[in-house]
Structures are given as C-alpha cells and as structure tokens.
Curated annotation (Swiss-Prot):
It catalyses: 2 [molybdopterin-synthase sulfur-carrier protein]-C-terminal-Gly-aminoethanethioate + cyclic pyranopterin phosphate + H2O = molybdopterin + 2 [molybdopterin-synthase sulfur-carrier protein]-C-terminal Gly-Gly + 2 H(+). Converts molybdopterin precursor Z to molybdopterin. This requires the incorporation of two sulfur atoms into precursor Z to generate a dithiolene group. The sulfur is provided by MoaD. The keyword Transferase applies. This is Molybdopterin synthase catalytic subunit. Pathway: Cofactor biosynthesis; molybdopterin biosynthesis. Belongs to the MoaE family. Keywords: Molybdenum cofactor biosynthesis, Transferase. It comes from Staphylococcus aureus (strain N315). PANTHER family: MOLYBDOPTERIN SYNTHASE RELATED (PTHR23404). Pfam families: MoaE.
Length: 148
C-alpha cells in the first residue's frame, strides 16, 4: 500500500484510514465513491477506468501536498481503482485526518474536486445500448504523457 496510488484490485478501506491516524489527529473523514446503477435515467451496466498511472500517482500526491498547505497538520491518503468496476464497487477512496473535524471535511471535499480537475483518469460508462468515455479535463492519454 502506498499513500497515493492507482490500483486494479478492490479497494480495502481500512488500511488507508489507518494510515492517516496518529496521536495528533482528532478526526478522520473517509470518502468512498462508488459505481452507481442509474445516472440521469440511464442504467449503467458497469464502468471501465483507465489512467496514466505514473502521472496519476504524482497528481494524487500533489493534491495531498496542496491539502497540507491549506490545512496544516492534515494527513491524506488517496487511492483510485482502474479496470472494470461493477455496480457498488468503490472507485475512489480519500482519507483525511486532522486535529479538528472541519479541516478534515473541507480537505476531503477539496481532494475529490481536484481529482476531477487534474488527475489523468478516464472513465468509460457502459450502458445496455452503448458506451461513452468521460474524464480528465486536460485531454487524452497522449496529452497527459506530454505533460509529464
């Protein structure tokens, strides 16, 4: 387990939560994002995630650094799963601890928004009658590689 990582296997939540705990932390907020069955009235069969792993892990660590600058004393761990994910599977987990709960909540919300903005992860939604790629705001895989 790494503090910031992309994985293929199902996410085991407890190890990431435990990573953020020490004697100075008074709160831990854990967010898990799951695959939902229905989106805007369309039934999802499953999702497929892809990532440019070296850069994605660097960007996840960058988010951890940003959080520590904005909310000193926090400890963050972020993991995102790639590959095919079934309904209710965990796609992303963010664990943030801090001396006080407000910082942990704010930092956790900040993390999920930054993941969507800067981490090169792409999501393909597969429905009964088709599919569509969604994802990273900065473009495709080749563009992400050039940024490295």
């Amino acid at each position: 387990m790494k503090q910031f990582e992309i994985v293929i296997e199902p996410i085991q939540t407890e190890q990431y939560r435990e990573f953020t705990i020490n004697e100075y932390q008074g709160a831990v907020v854990v967010f898990t994002g799951h695959v939902r069955e229905w989106t805007k009235g369309v039934k999802t069969e499953y999702l497929e995630y892809e990532a440019y792993i070296p850069m994605a892990e660097k960007k996840l660590a960058q988010i951890g650094d940003e959080i520590n600058e904005k909310w000193p004393g926090t400890i963050t761990s972020i993991v995102h799963r790639i590959g095919p994910l079934q309904i209710s599977d965990i796609a992303v987990l963010i664990a943030v601890s801090s001396p006080h709960r407000k910082d942990a909540y704010r930092a956790n919300e900040y993390a999920i928004e930054r993941i969507k903005e800067i981490v090169p992860i792409w999501k393909k939604e597969i429905w009964e009658d088709g599919s569509k790629w969604q994802g990273h705001q900065k473009g495709n895989y080749e563009e992400a590689k050039r940024e490295e």
